[in-house]
Amino acid sequence: MDPDPDHNHRPNFPLQLLDSSTSSSSTSLAIISTTSEPNSEPKKPPPKRTSTKDRHTKVEGRGRRIRMPAMCAARVFQLTRELGHKSDGETIEWLLQQAEPAVIAATGTGTIPANFTSLNISLRSSRSSLSAAHLRTTPSSYYFHSPHQSMTHHLQHQHQVRPKNESHSSSSSSSQLLDHNQMGNYLVQSTAGSLPTSQSPATAPFWSSGDNTQNLWAFNINPHHSGVVAGDVYNPNSGGSGGGSGVHLMNFAAPIALFSGQPLASGYGGGGGGGGEHSHYGVLAALNAAYRPVAETGNHNNNQQNRDGDHHHNHQEDGSTSHHS
C-alpha cells in the first residue's frame, strides 16, 4: 500500500492556529508594557498661585458656607470650643443673638427669625427701655398722683355710682376718707433724700416743734424749695450751738396752704439759747387745728342735706293728703 503522496504536504491547521495565538499574545504584552512606562514617571506639582487679596476661611453656618476673614474665623473656632457648641454655625447664631439689640438700633431690622427662643434677649431689653421711656414721658404716673386729684376722682366716681337718696351718707363718709387719705399721703422723710421738685405738690412754709426738750421739726411746704433744708435742727438745750439730729422733712398737700397765714411758731430762728421758750405748737395739735374746719364743714353740709331731705319729704306728704281730701 503506497502512502499518500500529499500526506507529507498537508498543512497542519491546529498547529498554525496555536502559533498565531501565541504571536498575538506576545504583541499584546508588548503594547501593555509600552503604555505603562509613561505612568511610572513622577508628576510635577502645580505652581502655587500668589494673590494680593486677604486670605479668607470658609466657616459653616446656617445651612451654607460663608467666607470671613481669618481672624474672625479663628475667633469663631475658639468660641465654639469654649462654649461647647456642636458646630461653628451655632456659635455664629449665638453671636447674632448677643448683638441683636445693637443690630436693631443700627439698622432698624433684626437678623434672626422672629421666634421667642432667639429673640428673648432683644425683646427683654426693648421692653425695659419702652417702660422706662413711658415712665419718663407720662405727666402723672402711678406713684406720683396728687392726693387731691386722686380723692377728687374717687369722690366723682362715688357720686355717679350711688343713687341720690344716699347722697347725705356718702358726703360724711367721703369727708372721712378725705381726711384719712390725706393723712396717709404725707411723706415724712429724713436728710437721706426727698422727692424731685417737679413731683412735689405746691405747698407753703410751716415750722413747728414739741416741748422745750425736743428738737425742732421742719416741715417744708415751700413750692420754690422742695429739697432738704441745709444745716442742723434747732435744739433749745444746746444754747444756740447748732447741735441736734438731721432735719426731718414732711411734704404737705395743697389743703395745708392755709397754715401760711397763721403764726404757728415764733421762736424757731432765735440765735440765743432762750429762743425755744416762745410759743411752740406740737405737730398733732397743729394737724388737729388744721382739719377741725374741714370736719366742721363736712358736718354742716351733712346737717343741711338732712334738713333739705326732711323738708322735701314733708312737702310730699302734704301734697298727698291734700290730694286724698
Curated annotation (Swiss-Prot):
PANTHER family (UniProt xref): TRANSCRIPTION FACTOR TCP15-RELATED, TRANSCRIPTION FACTOR TCP4-RELATED
Biased composition (Basic and acidic residues): 51-63, 307-325
Compartments (UniProt record): Nucleus
InterPro entries noted in UniProt: TF_TCP_subgr, Transcription_factor_TCP
PROSITE patterns reported for this sequence: TCP
Keyword DNA-binding assigned: yes
Source organism phylogeny: Eukaryota, Viridiplantae, Streptophyta, Embryophyta, Tracheophyta
Polar residues compositional bias, start-end: 141-153
GO MF annotations in UniProt: DNA-binding transcription factor activity; transcription cis-regulatory region binding
Main subcellular location: nucleus
Entry's Gene Ontology BP terms: cell division; circadian rhythm; DNA endoreduplication; gynoecium development; inflorescence development; regulation of anthocyanin biosynthetic process; regulation of DNA-templated transcription; response to cytokinin
Subunit-level organization: Interacts with APRR5. Interacts with SPY. Interacts with SPL. Interacts with SRFR1. Interacts with GAI and RGL2. Interacts with DA1, DAR1 and DAR2. Interacts with SCE1. Interacts with MOS1.
Gene Ontology, cellular component aspect: nucleus
Tissue: Expressed in archespores, pollen mother cell, ovule primordia and megaspore mother cells. Expressed in young proliferating tissues. Expressed in developing embryos, and seeds during germination.
Note: Plants overexpressing TCP14 exhibit altered plant development and occasionally are lethal.
Domain TCP, first and last residues per copy: 52-106
Biased composition (Low complexity): 20-36
Induction of its expression: Circadian-regulation with the lowest expression in the middle of the dark period. Induced during seed imbibition. Induced by cytokinin.
Function (record text): Transcription factor involved the regulation of plant development. Together with TCP14, modulates plant stature by promoting cell division in young internodes. Represses cell proliferation in developing leaf blade and specific floral tissues. Together with TCP15, acts downstream of gibberellin (GA), and the stratification pathways that promote seed germination. Involved in the control of cell proliferation at the root apical meristem (RAM) by regulating the activity of CYCB1-1. Acts together with SPY to promote cytokinin responses that affect leaf shape and trichome development in flowers.
Protein name: Transcription factor TCP15
Keywords: Developmental protein, DNA-binding, Nucleus, Transcription, Transcription regulation
Region (Disordered): 1-64, 141-178, 296-325
Disruption phenotype: Reduction in inflorescence height and pedicel length. Delayed germination.
Pfam family, one: TCP
